[in-house]
Amino acid sequence: MKNKKRVLIASSLSCAILLLSAATTQANSAHKDSQDQNKKEHVDKSQQKDKRNVTNKDKNSTAPDDIGKNGKITKRTETVYDEKTNILQNLQFDFIDDPTYDKNVLLVKKQGSIHSNLKFESHKEEKNSNWLKYPSEYHVDFQVKRNRKTEILDQLPKNKISTAKVDSTFSYSSGGKFDSTKGIGRTSSNSYSKTISYNQQNYDTIASGKNNNWHVHWSVIANDLKYGGEVKNRNDELLFYRNTRIATVENPELSFASKYRYPALVRSGFNPEFLTYLSNEKSNEKTQFEVTYTRNQDILKNRPGIHYAPPILEKNKDGQRLIVTYEVDWKNKTVKVVDKYSDDNKPYKEG
C-alpha cells in the first residue's frame, strides 16, 4: 500500500513538473512573438517612412529626362538589320510631353552601322583584272512621308564638318525652345539634351543644301585618305596602289596596299549618329518616316604582272542601300516598322 502511495505521489509530481515546463515554454514563446511583432512593426514603419521619403523626393525633383516641372520623356527604340547589304539601322525615338507647348515633339536619333564591305576581286576578262571595291561615301536619308502636319525643325550635324570626330549637343527647353551647340554637355537644368558623337577620320560630313522641313540628308565622303606613310586623295587613281609585279589574277589583294593600313571607315565601316527634331500638330495621330542608309563604292582597277597599265578609278560605281519605313503613333507614343527593303547596285546620286 505504501509503495502504491509513493508511486501516485511521484506521478503527481511528474505531471506538475510537465505542466510547469509547458507553461514556461508558452510564456517564453509568447514573449518572443511579441518581441518579433514589435520588431516587424518597427521595420514596416521604417520602410513606409523611407518609401514616403522616396516618393516625395520623386515628386518634388526633376529627373534627368524631365522637362521642367511637369514635362516627361517617353523613349522607344527600333532596330532593323539586313543581311544582304550588311547594314543595321538603330533608331531612338524620344517623345517629349511638354504641357507648355501646343504641339507634339519628337527627337529621332539615327544610329547603327554601315559595314564597309571592302572587297578584292578578280576579273580575268579585263586587262586591269584586279579590283578593289571600297566605301567612298556613306549616306543617311530621313524624310516625312506625305504628311504636312509633321515638320522637321532642326538637325544635327549641320553644314560641313571635316574634323576627325564629330560631337554636338541638342537641347530642348519648355515651350518649344531648342538650341544646338558643338561638343557634349547640357545647357540648363530645365532642358532635355541629346548628344551625337562619331568618328570620321579622312572623311567629311556634308548636310545637303536641299534639306527642308520634310527631308534631310547627310553624306559622309572620303577626302584625303591616309594609309601607312601615304596620303592620297579619293580622286587619285594611284590610291592604295602597290607595285603589281608580284600580283597575279588569282591574288588580287597583292595589287593594293595591305588593308590593315587603311583608315577605319575604309577597313571596317561607319557608325552614324544623326539627329532630327520634329514637331507635330496634335490633330494628327500618325506619321510615317522613311529612313535610308546607303553605301557607295569606288572601284580601283590595277593590272597584275610585269606589263604596266595605268590604274583605273571608277567613282560611285556600286552601292547598296537599306530602306525602312517607320510609323509613329503620337497618341500612344509607340513606333513600329511597316516596310523594309534593300537592293544592290544602287549608289546614292543627288538629284
From Swiss-Prot:
Domain of life: Bacteria
Renumbered residue ranges of the record's region Disordered: 27-71
SUPFAM superfamilies (UniProt xref): Leukocidin-like
Keywords, comma-separated and alphabetical: Signal
Biased composition range(s): Basic and acidic residues: 30-60
Biological processes annotated in GO: cytolysis in another organism
Family the entry assigns: Belongs to the aerolysin family.
Official protein name in the record: Uncharacterized leukocidin-like protein 2
Organism field: Staphylococcus aureus (strain NCTC 8325 / PS 47)
